[in-house]
From Swiss-Prot:
Gene name of the record: CCT4
GO CC term, one of those recorded: chaperonin-containing T-complex
Species for this entry: Yarrowia lipolytica (strain CLIB 122 / E 150) (Yeast)
Keyword Cell membrane: no
Pfam family, any one: Cpn60_TCP1
Name of this chain's protein: T-complex protein 1 subunit delta
Record flagged with keyword Cytoplasm: yes
Keyword entries, A-Z: ATP-binding, Chaperone, Cytoplasm, Nucleotide-binding
GO molecular function: ATP binding; ATP hydrolysis activity; ATP-dependent protein folding chaperone; unfolded protein binding
Length: 527
């Protein structure tokens, strides 16, 4: 039982900060342990059931944590940490949480030795900066025009996912998509905006049937029930956000019809109104019309479809609001909210728009427009669970390529970087004295959690494998890492490589998170 001690300034509970830190460290390490089995090519998947009953199967750290019912504030910091790694590098979301948990475990040992938390936090921060330097010293600069190297980096990311058996098909496709969507920087490098690459999910077929298309692909179909076209060459594309149906009166108004002549008059007026809309669209030289989905009523009436078909205008309806921006970038069409503003200068263009049927589902494909760098990836799969996880896997691999475009340098995977960091930091700790030496030594030991976890998940003996790795690194084999087939091997020869940015950001962010948690000595709840 903690006893408050009386001082001039009042009563102070000396044990409370220790209990708060212990609680924070336990909660954070519990989160890290929960996803530890998901790391690496032999990592296990998690099945998550959301509050709405939706089932998700994934081994992506960020996805698992985002859906986990986490209550403790310190544990929520690790969820945010994974999200930060996802936004910075896109990959390494599991590694960063495991590293943070390991660093907090090391900090717990140091706290028990009586070292002040501020000293631990400061030394961990310095050690992380030194670790990032060690990783960059190990890195190998690459030429972004070297397609084979980019494919190997994308394959390494895909090999730990559900789509690993299809990585030889998907990796080249992703590299082609990234190079097509990339833009040149003033310095002569490349920059990749993932908003220029759209992943469309379509049920049916297998993952192997996933295809890449330059330009735009819509998971919709051309309306043909009124006899409209499903293929249009030299397309002039209009994008509307208003309804092609008769105007409705306000809720409080009503119309009283006394005889058939008045009814005929109303129907004739509606017919003339809709015909006027169709003629205005045709007058602008539009021959492909995209209509945004409406939650209020049908966005387009059967009569409007009939008139548009007679005018030989291809109609694609129920376009999602989220797709509007990508459609505008791909085709050059500007969204129009009123028929008065629907003019020729608002139209986009492309050489060909056609409806394509594959594996029992229909899509509409737009050929790439000159000057546009957008691409679409059509993901196929047997069920929604597979398709959703495939989409997440492709997104992670694209983020790896984006990281390479930002920092064009590769490092060996398989825990090679972490072992090298542990060796260098461990040596430097022996040249120090005082609390810094102990903190650096514990930091170096904490780094070994990644190779240890990889070995455990691959069914290897972690003690033997990590010891062998340390011996090989001591001999100068800095590229030696864990191979799930051979135990230890040279990672570059195994083509297990990843962007330097993924590793450096994981170590830096994990140390920052550990520092933030160590500096907390109380938890207060607001009213």
């Amino acid at each position: 039982m903690s006893v408050p001690t009386g001082t001039k300034s009042g009563f102070k509970n000396k044990e409370k900060p220790l209990e708060v830190r212990k609680s924070n460290i336990l909660a954070a390490r519990a989160v890290a342990d929960a996803i530890r089995t998901s790391l690496g090519p032999k990592g296990m998947d998690k099945m998550i059931q959301t509050a709405r009953g939706q089932v998700i199967i994934s081994n992506d750290g960020n996805t698992i944590l985002q859906h986990m019912a986490v209550m403790h504030p310190a544990a929520k910091m690790l969820v945010d940490l994974s999200a930060s790694q996802d936004s910075v590098a896109g990959d390494g979301t599991t590694s960063v949480v495991i590293l943070a948990g390991s660093l907090l475990g090391a900090a717990d040992k140091l706290l028990k030795k009586g070292i002040h938390p501020s000293i631990i936090a400061e030394n961990f921060q310095k050690a992380a900066q030194r670790a990032a330097e060690v990783v960059m010293d190990m890195s190998k600069p690459i030429d972004l025009s070297d397609r084979e190297t980019l494919i190997r980096a994308a394959s390494t990311s895909l090999n730990s996912k559900i789509v690993s058996q299809f990585s030889s098909t998907l990796a080249p496709m992703l590299v082609d998509a990234a190079l097509q969507a990339a833009k040149k920087t003033p310095e002569g490098g490349l920059t990749l905006d993932l908003n220029d690459i759209r992943i469309i999910k379509s049920l049916g077929g297998t993952i192997e049937d996933t295809t890449l298309a330059n330009g735009l692909v819509l998971n919709n179909y051309a309306v043909k029930n009124a006899g409209g076209p499903s293929r249009m060459e030299k397309a002039k594309i209009g994008l509307i956000q208003f309804q092609l149906s008769a105007p409705k009166p306000d809720m409080e108004n009503h119309i009283v019809v006394n005889d058939y002549r008045q009814m005929d008059k109303i129907l004739k007026e509606e017919r003339q109104y809709i015909l006027g809309l169709a003629k205005a669209i045709k007058k602008s030289k539009c021959n492909v019309l995209l209509i945004q989905k409406s939650i209020l009523r049908d966005a387009v009436s059967e009569l409007a479809l009939h008139f548009l078909a007679k005018l030989n205008i291809m109609v694609i309806k129920d376009i999602e609001r989220d797709d509007i921006e990508f459609i505008s970038r791909s085709t050059g069409a500007k969204p129009v909210a009123d028929i008065e503003a629907f003019t020729e200068d608002k139209l986009g263009s492309c050489d060909l728009v056609e409806e394509v049927e594959s594996s029992g589902s229909k899509t509409v494909r737009f050929s790439s427009r000159e000057g546009s760098n957008t691409v679409s990836i059509l993901v196929r799969g047997a069920n929604d669970l597979v398709i959703d996880e495939t989409e997440r896997s492709l997104h992670d691999a694209l983020c790896v390529l984006r990281s390479l475009f930002r920092v064009p340098a590769l490092v060996p995977g398989g825990g090679a970087c972490e072992v090298q960091v542990a060796q260098v930091i461990g040596k430097e700790s022996r040249a120090m004295d005082g609390a810094s030496a102990i903190c650096y030594e514990e930091f170096s030991n904490a780094m070994l959690v990644i190779p240890t976890t990889l070995a455990e998940n691959a069914g290897l003996n972690p003690v033997n494998v990590v010891t062998e790795l340390r011996v090989r690194h001591e001999k100068g084999e800095v590229n030696a890492g864990i191979s799930v087939r051979r135990g230890t091997s040279i990672m570059v020869e195994e083509h297990v490589i990843q962007p330097a940015l993924v590793t450096t950001s994981a170590i830096t962010l994990a140390a920052e998170c550990a520092k933030g948690l160590l500096r907390i000595d109380d938890i207060a709840f607001s009213r």
